[in-house]
């Protein structure tokens, strides 16, 4: 089995670089010097499209996926292979340690440094918050104290998501994804630490780093049934490429409260490796989690990216 630079299994399946056949004909005219943003749900072919655009027009592929930043996840996050990263300029992939915290603010500062390099950026990913921070601006919210983070972790574990949602201010609750535990906990922490709701802080947002009017913004809108089939097929290939071994390598010191532990499929495979569920159940649960994640992504894109150029698939 192939390995990456850190000795971990590296994805080899051609599925990871497949562009759906009906995608390219839907592209608008894209000047070679204009920044490109590509958003889409998991397994929709967006990363392969970014590579094609850089191959054809030059520039650098920039990651906008909150899990592809972590060095422990190449296969499970569908990060580009080591060979792909070497073939073209790539930025912000696999550069963060598994135990480090990494926020949209961290990402935005690093993107600013990439833009300063002067290469045309093709920014691609499925984390909607990164794109909104980039094109709409990001509020300067004070850092959450460790004791508040610990209190939030305990409260979510003991009282559950619904209770935490009920304790949010109404303005924030109306704006965030209430099905996303990470987003809800972050909003709860801000309110607890500062006495002001997240929505109030966001109202004091600085100007955007890259306004939408200065970029070609593409959002992939796949048919849910078609996408579900691709998700299931891709996870099968991930397993064949060594996803279980990748999770096994991350098992020592596993901490489910870390942001890196939110990799889709990781908790399910950890449960199997700990003897809690059989492998077939873990795989089925991981596929379900991936489909549910894709649904949340589609909802975000539909509600927040109405001015982006749509690409319908298949």
From Swiss-Prot:
One Gene Ontology term of the molecular function aspect: ATP binding
Marked site: Interaction with substrate tRNA: 127, 149
Binding residues annotated for substrate, in chain numbering: 42-47
EC supergroup of this enzyme: transferase
GO BP: tRNA modification
EC number: 2.5.1.75
InterPro entries reported in the protein's UniProt record: Dimethylallyltransferase, IPT, P-loop_NTPase
Entry keywords, A to Z: ATP-binding, Magnesium, Nucleotide-binding, Transferase, tRNA processing
Function: Catalyzes the transfer of a dimethylallyl group onto the adenine at position 37 in tRNAs that read codons beginning with uridine, leading to the formation of N6-(dimethylallyl)adenosine (i(6)A).
Similarity section: Belongs to the IPP transferase family.
Co-factor(s): Mg(2+)
Native source organism of the sequence: Cereibacter sphaeroides (strain KD131 / KCTC 12085) (Rhodobacter sphaeroides)
Known partners and oligomeric status: Monomer.
Annotated positions binding ATP: 40-47
Catalytic activity: adenosine(37) in tRNA + dimethylallyl diphosphate = N(6)-dimethylallyladenosine(37) in tRNA + diphosphate
SUPFAM superfamilies: P-loop containing nucleoside triphosphate hydrolases (SSF52540)
Protein name according to UniProt: tRNA dimethylallyltransferase
């Amino acid at each position: 089995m192939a390995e990456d630079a850190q000795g971990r299994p590296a994805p080899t399946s051609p599925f990871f670089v497949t562009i759906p056949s009906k995608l390219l004909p839907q592209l608008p005219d894209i000047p070679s010097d204009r920044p490109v943003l590509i958003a889409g749900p998991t397994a929709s072919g967006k990363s392969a499209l970014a590579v094609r655009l850089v191959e054809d027009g030059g520039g650098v592929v920039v990651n906008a996926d909150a899990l592809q930043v972590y060095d422990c996840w190449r296969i499970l996050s569908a990060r580009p292979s080591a060979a792909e990263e070497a073939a073209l300029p790539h930025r912000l992939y696999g550069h963060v340690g598994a135990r480090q915290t990494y926020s949209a603010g961290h990402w935005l500062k690093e993107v600013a440094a990439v833009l300063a390099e002067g290469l045309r950026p093709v920014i691609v990913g499925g984390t909607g918050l990164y794109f909104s921070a980039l094109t709409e601006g990001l509020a300067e919210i004070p850092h959450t104290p460790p004791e508040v983070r610990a209190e939030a972790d305990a409260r979510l574990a003991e009282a559950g998501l619904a209770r935490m949602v009920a304790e949010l201010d109404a303005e924030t609750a109306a704006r965030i994804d209430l099905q996303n535990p990470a987003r809800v906990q972050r909003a709860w922490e801000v309110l607890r630490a500062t006495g002001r709701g997240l929505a109030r802080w966001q109202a004091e947002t600085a100007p955007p780093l890259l306004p939408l009017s200065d970029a070609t913004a593409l959002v992939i809108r796949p048919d849910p049934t078609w996408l579900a089939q691709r998700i299931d097929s891709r996870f099968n290939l991930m397993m064949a490429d060594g996803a279980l071994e990748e999770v096994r390598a991350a098992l020592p010191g596993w901490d489910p409260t870390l942001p890196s532990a939110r990799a889709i499929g990781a908790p399910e495979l950890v449960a199997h490796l700990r003897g809690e569920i059989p492998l077939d159940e873990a795989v089925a649960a991981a596929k379900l989690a991936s489909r549910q994640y894709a649904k949340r992504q589609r909802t975000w894109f539909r509600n927040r990216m109405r001015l982006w150029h749509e690409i319908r698939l298949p």
